[in-house]
């Protein structure tokens, strides 16, 4: 898998790439990540990539020429080009799984300022949001989407860990505990100390259902529908 990120601020990705699971995935050749400053593709002598809106309005708009030039420079036959924007479809675990199974190369365009010239839609495949809120730029969403995809690649995380995670089968993850056994009067549930594997598995499943029903009723309904 290769992930190309087009951003005006490539330095913001340095720490994310150099640490923990993402760094190991890169070292093990499980993923290639390139962060490209699309300012390099502008023909403006002052390296400007934004301009005022036609029709007036607050905020500057990203010009289309440098972004399209950058896309064309790196796009291949199996590239999937996406734009991070609050106007997009909300990204979720199911989409992350689809990305892994369908694409070898994902290009993520991280927005900034007031957004993109609307004509960018002729040159991309989809728009995605990471939630119903607005951020100062698309750098964090591009990292979130990339991270969610990379951890699903073969060998990046153990299969047993992925099987019990939140959103697997539309359920949130179960509670976990470690030492000490008792902390300020709060004790680890006795059933987890029983050594009875089936009872522990049943308890954890019940906890998943309870937590999902309380915190994510929309997800719980999908779980119920999937059981039918």
From Swiss-Prot:
GO terms for molecular function: tRNA (guanine(37)-N1)-methyltransferase activity. It catalyses: guanosine(37) in tRNA + S-adenosyl-L-methionine = N(1)-methylguanosine(37) in tRNA + S-adenosyl-L-homocysteine + H(+). S-adenosyl-L-methionine binds at residues 111, 130-135. It comes from the Bacteria. GO terms for cellular component: cytosol. One of its GO terms (biological process) is tRNA N1-guanine methylation. Its EC number is 2.1.1.228. Its main location: cytoplasm. Keywords: Cytoplasm, Methyltransferase, S-adenosyl-L-methionine, Transferase, tRNA processing. It holds the Pfam family tRNA_m1G_MT. It is found in: Cytoplasm. Belongs to the RNA methyltransferase TrmD family. Specifically methylates guanosine-37 in various tRNAs. Homodimer. PANTHER family: TRNA (GUANINE-N(1)-)-METHYLTRANSFERASE. This is tRNA (guanine-N(1)-)-methyltransferase. It comes from Ureaplasma parvum serovar 3 (strain ATCC 700970). The gene is trmD.
């Amino acid at each position: 898998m290769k992930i190309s990120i087009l951003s005006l601020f490539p330095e913001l990705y340095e720490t994310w790439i150099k640490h923990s699971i993402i760094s190991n995935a890169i070292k093990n050749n499980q993923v290639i990540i390139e962060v490209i400053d699309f300012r390099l593709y502008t023909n403006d002598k002052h390296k400007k990539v934004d301009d005022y809106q036609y029709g007036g309005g607050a905020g500057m708009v990203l010009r289309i020429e440098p972004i399209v030039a950058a896309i064309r420079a790196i796009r291949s036959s199996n590239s999937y080009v996406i734009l991070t924007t609050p106007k997009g479809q909300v990204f979720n675990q199911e989409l992350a799984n689809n990305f892994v199974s369908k694409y070898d190369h994902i290009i993520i365009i991280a927005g900034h300022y007031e957004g993109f010239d609307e004509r960018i839609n002729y040159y991309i495949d989809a728009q995605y949001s990471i939630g119903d809120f607005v951020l100062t730029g698309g750098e964090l969403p591009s990292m979130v989407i990339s991270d969610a995809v990379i951890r699903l690649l073969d060998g990046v995380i153990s299969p047993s860990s992925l099987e019990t995670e939140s959103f697997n089968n539309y359920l949130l993850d179960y509670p976990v505990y470690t030492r000490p056994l008792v902390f300020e009067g709060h004790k680890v549930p006795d059933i987890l100390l029983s050594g009875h594997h089936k009872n522990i598995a049943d308890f954890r499943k019940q906890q998943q259902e309870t937590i999902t029903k309380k915190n994510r009723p929309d997800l719980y309904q999908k779980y119920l529908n999937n059981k039918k």
